[in-house]
Amino acid sequence: MSAQPISDFYAYPDAAGHFGKFGGRFVAETLIGPLQELSAAYDQARQDPSFIAEYDKDLKHYVGRPSPIYHAERLSREVGGAQILLKREDLNHTGAHKINNTIGQALLASRMGKTRIIAETGAGQHGVASATVAARLGLECVVYMGATDIERQKINVYRMKLLGATVIPVTSGSATLKDALNEAMRDWVTNVRDTFYIIGTVAGPDPYPRMVRDFNAIVGREAREQMLQDYGRLPDAISACVGGGSNAIGLFHAFLNDPGVKIYGAEAAGDGIATGRHAASIAAGRPGVLHGNRTYVICDDDGQITETHSISAGLDYPGVGPEHSFLSDSGRAVYQGITDDEAMAAFHLLAHTEGILAALESSHAVAQSIKLARELPRDALVLCNLSGRGDKDVHTIAAREGIAL
C-alpha cells in the first residue's frame, strides 16, 4: 500500500511512463529510438482533432459503439443480493473489446507511414482484431501466437487467416502469450522501419500501457454516462477480468477518482493459487521486470519467470499491466483469484439464465461479480465488463467436459 493516499489517479503515468514505482521503459538500446518515435507520434496524434474524429467515426460505424449496459435480471435473481449489470463489449465487431485498441493503433500506424503491422495474441481475439483492421486499411499483418494457444483456439486462428493475416506459431518456452510477445518484440526490432507493433494489452514499455489504456477508455466513459442516464447514479462496484488487463483498465479508468465506486479485478487462479498452477500475477506474484516494464510478475525465488496456467488463453500471462500494479499497491483496486472451476460455473449460469455465452476470460469477471453480488444488498449495483463472447471457447469447454464435437 502507498504511504500517502492518491488524490488524482489521472496524474499518472508521469512523463517517463511511470505509475508510481511501476511501468517505465526497460528495453534494449535498439528499441529506445523506435519507442521515442512512437511516443512522439502518439502524443501528436492524440492532440489532433482530425485523428480523434476519424477514430470516433470508426468506433461508431465500424465497431458499432456504444455498447449497451444490460441488466442481467434472471442472473441477479438466481444469485441473490445485488443487481448485476453487464457492459456488453461482446457485441462489438469481432466479438470483444480488443477492436477498440487495434483501430486506434492501426490508424496511428497509417499516420506514421508504416505498411506492416505485427501483433501477439493469446486467446486470438487481439489477433483477429489486428487482422481485421489491417484488412480494412490495406496493411500487411503478421500475428505471433503460442503453439499451445493455437491448439486451443483453432477457430480464431482460421478467422485470422481468412482476414489475410499470416499466423506464426511460437514453440519456445510454454508456447503461450508471453512467448508470442517475445517473438513479436524480436520482429519489431528487426523490421522497425516499415513495421508497427500493435500490443494488445496494457503491458510493454512506455508508451504502450497508456496508449492501449487510452484507446480502451471509451468503455468506461460510455459506462459512466450510461449509468448516470439509466440508473441516476454510479455503480457500487465494478469488475473486470485481468490478464494483462486492457479491458479492465478500459472500464476502471473513468471511475478511478470516484471513491464511492469499489473496483475489483478478477485474475486467473487456475487450479487454485496454492497449487502453483495459476496466472494471478498480483494476488500471488512479486515486483519484477517483464516485457519492458516493471510490474507484478509470477517468478521463482531467483526472479525467473515461471510457467502459468489458466483454462483461459487470454489470461494465461505471467505479468500484468503496470497501472494495475499501481492501483493494487495504492489500495484503489482489489485483485482476486478466480479458479477455472469458478469461471466455468459462471459461464454455464450466465448461459442458462440470460442466453449469453461469455468468453472464458470474461467468465472470470462474471464469477467475481456473482461473489460480490451475494455480499451486497438487493438495491446495490455491480457492473461487470463482459469483455468478449464465448464462441471461440466452445471446443475448450466441450473437451473439458468430455464432449466430442
Swiss-Prot record:
GO terms for molecular function: tryptophan synthase activity. Keywords: Amino-acid biosynthesis, Aromatic amino acid biosynthesis, Lyase, Pyridoxal phosphate, Tryptophan biosynthesis. InterPro entries: Trp_synth_b_CS, Trp_synth_beta, Trp_synth_beta/beta-like, TrpB-like_PALP, TrpB-like_PALP_sf. Its EC number is 4.2.1.20. Gene3D superfamilies: 3.40.50.1100. Tetramer of two alpha and two beta chains. PANTHER family: TRYPTOPHAN SYNTHASE, TRYPTOPHAN SYNTHASE-RELATED. Belongs to the TrpB family. This is Tryptophan synthase beta chain. The gene is trpB.
